[in-house]
A protein has these predicted regions:
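Phosphate- and other anionic-substrate recognition elements at nucleic-acid/protein interfaces
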Residues: 51-64, 70-73, 77, 82-209
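Extended, highly charged clamp/arch subdomains and adjacent linkers
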Residues: 1-73, 92, 115-120, 124
Length: 209
């Protein structure tokens, strides 16, 4: 403000100098500064929007171009703490074969029981891949899957994969999901969707409204 005032005051000793300085200060604080702030904010917002769009586009491209996993029976897991982990097995065509709800994490901590259930489902349906949703409790569930695979009779024939569960809850509550799985609750439909996303990501993602 002082620098701007000096540019407007020809004679600092003039009796009008204080009034000119006051006018410059008022003009800056009331008019110029807010305008500059709005312009900078608009530029920053535009840059952030452009970066967000670029990041979203890149992530979406990677998601849509994921190669399908054909010919494998998959055990899909929708992780959770208090409400448990929903588990659904789908065959190579995406047909739901069976499932269960396990409670390996807090507060129930029924870890061994959960492992036994997973061992049983893998053996019963011949599933060779565990697809784990990457949301809440995913890291804890990843450790569970790793233990189950390590304890399996043929650990080399099993694997687990982290799968993006973005939009799974939207699909599971949709009319399409209800029509396809009228006998399954919402969370179990989500586990089916997670398993299918590994088998054919594009075919499953297009169902999200």
């Amino acid at each position: 403000v002082e620098w701007m005032a000096q540019g407007q005051i020809a004679n600092p000793r003039s009796s009008f100098a204080p009034q000119i300085r006051q006018a410059v200060e008022d003009g800056y604080r009331r008019l110029l500064a807010p305008s500059i702030e709005r312009e900078l904010r608009a530029e920053s917002t535009a840059a952030c929007d452009e970066h967000a769009i670029s990041t979203f586009s890149r992530n979406l491209r990677q998601l849509l171009l994921q190669p399908p996993l054909k010919g494998r029976t998959v055990l899909g897991v929708d992780p959770g703490f208090r409400t448990g982990c929903k588990v659904a097995v789908v065959d190579a065509t995406g047909k739901h074969l069976g499932g269960a709800t396990i409670y390996p994490h807090e507060p129930q901590r029924r870890w061994d029981e959960a492992k036994a259930t997973l061992h049983g489902l893998l053996a019963e349906h011949g599933a060779t891949v565990i697809a784990i949703g990457n949301g809440t409790a995913s890291r804890e569930t990843e450790r569970l899957a790793a233990e189950v695979i390590a304890e399996a009779a043929d650990p080399q024939g099993l694997a687990y994969v982290m799968v993006s569960e973005a939009g799974a809850s939207v699909y599971s509550a949709s009319e399409l999901a209800r029509a396809e799985f009228p006998d399954l609750d919402v969370s179990m439909r989500g586990a089916v969707s997670i398993g299918r996303r590994l088998q054919d990501p594009l075919a499953e993602l297009v169902k999200i409204d």
